[in-house]
Amino acid sequence: MRFDAVIFDLDGVICSTDEYHYKAWKAMADGMGIPFDRTINNRLRGVSRMASLEIILEKYHGPALSDEEKARLAEQKNDLYRESLKEMSPADLPAEVKETLDTLRGMGLKLAIGSSSKNTPFILKQIGLGGWFDAVSDGNNITRSKPDPEVFVKAAEMLGIPAERCLVVEDAVSGAEAGHRGGMKVACVGDAAKNGAGDWNMESVRELIDITKG
């Protein structure tokens, strides 16, 4: 076997919460009169909440905001987002993803989540994967967001697997960079795959089965 563990990004790989994020950020930005569209939203992929806020505030021309005010804005966005996440269910977990996860586990691989989101445990519970993974490294136990490799390095440590024996699965270029900086190979889907950011650039997560076999 080429790898002993697979570490998955959550959003855009296991499930998609893009639309929930977009609507929450847009509601916050609209309330402050800040222009916000899907082009700006695309820059937020794989980026932490506070770093995302700073990107949005590039278009803000009002009075200077204190750190406390910025924290309140980020919290407001998260409240809107978390409320919308209550609509998520196991139906938001694509069948091909669940089948691939089950197959990889059956092959004896350790499986983990590596996500910058502090909402990771809630989302996993909503889609029926609460407690399913061998390890979950997320925004609640890291201090640096992607492209810093911390989230993936911690996931590997939690699994007890050397970095070079871990495969990272990502859909964001910043996440692919994080995996590489952590000394891991990376398989990409979505935008990251289109940009050729991975060691393998996939059209479907099902390709992971052959990739991990080597």
Question: What spans do the regions from the language model cover?
Answer:
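Conserved SAM-binding loop
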Residues: 14, 93, 113, 144, ...
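Short helix-capping segments at alpha-helix termini
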Residues: 31-34, 61-65, 128-132, 160-161
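Asp-based, Mg2+/Mn2+-dependent phosphohydrolase catalytic module
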Residues: 1-4, 98, 102-105, 117-214
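Short, acidic loop-to-helix structural element flanking the phosphoryl-transfer center
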Residues: 2, 83-113
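A metal-dependent, Asp-based hydrolase signature
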Residues: 46-84, 103
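Short, surface-exposed alpha-helical segments at coil->helix boundaries
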Residues: 18-23, 50, 121, 149
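Active-site neighborhood of HAD-like aspartate-dependent phosphohydrolases
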Residues: 1-42
